């Protein structure tokens, strides 16, 4: 059972996934900072000094902090756009590699052509013997 777990845990895909999760978490922090510290203040300046984090609806002692929700939506949209662009570039690169592989199929050499002809002749001889 331990050996099976080691095979699973140290497979390339699992390690790649773990690295992706760690990088994704770090990327999420960067995007959150970008939205919170740069984009939201710029939007606030354009919209007349509005600070999105201060936007709220108060009911007695309770508040609905919809400004934070708007900021989280910006986070999501930027992360989604970045992932979309990454996947688009990745797909374009992999499709180019596949096209190059298809183009790289070499023409058969004279030896290969002759071997193919010999194979075909042997098949004909064997099939004519089977008929007789």
From Swiss-Prot:
PROSITE patterns attached to this UniProt entry: MSCL
Keyword Cell membrane present in the record's keywords: the answer is yes
Spell out the GO cellular component terms annotated for this protein, sorted alphabetically and separated by semicolons: plasma membrane
Subcellular locations according to the entry = Cell membrane
Q: Which UniProt keywords apply?
A: Cell membrane, Ion channel, Ion transport, Membrane, Transmembrane, Transmembrane helix, Transport
How this chain sits in the membrane, per its record, is: Multi-pass membrane protein
The transmembrane segments are 14-34, 67-87
What GO annotations for molecular function exist for this entry? Answer: mechanosensitive monoatomic ion channel activity
Entry's InterPro entries? Mechanosensitive_channel_CS, MS_channel, MSC/AndL, MscL_channel
HAMAP family, alphabetized: MscL
Q: Which function does this protein serve?
A: Channel that opens in response to stretch forces in the membrane lipid bilayer. May participate in the regulation of osmotic pressure changes within the cell.
Quote the subunit structure annotation.
Answer: Homopentamer.
Q: Which family does it belong to?
A: Belongs to the MscL family.
What this protein is called in its record is: Large-conductance mechanosensitive channel
Give the taxonomic lineage as stored in the record.
Bacteria, Bacillati, Bacillota, Bacilli, Bacillales
């Amino acid at each position: 059972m331990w050996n099976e777990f080691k095979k699973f845990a140290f497979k390339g895909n699992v390690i790649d996934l773990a690295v992706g999760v760690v990088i994704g978490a770090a990327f999420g922090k960067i995007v959150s900072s970008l939205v919170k510290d740069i984009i939201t203040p710029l939007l606030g300046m354009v919209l007349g000094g509005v600070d999105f984090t201060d936007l709220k609806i108060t009911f007695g002692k309770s508040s609905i902090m919809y400004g934070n929700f708007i900021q989280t939506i910006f986070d999501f949209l930027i992360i989604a756009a970045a992932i979309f662009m990454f996947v688009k570039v990745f797909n374009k690169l992999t499709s180019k590699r596949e096209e190059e592989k298809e183009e790289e199929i070499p023409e058969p050499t004279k030896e290969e052509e002759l071997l193919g002809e010999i194979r075909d002749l042997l098949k004909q001889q064997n099939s004519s013997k089977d008929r007789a």
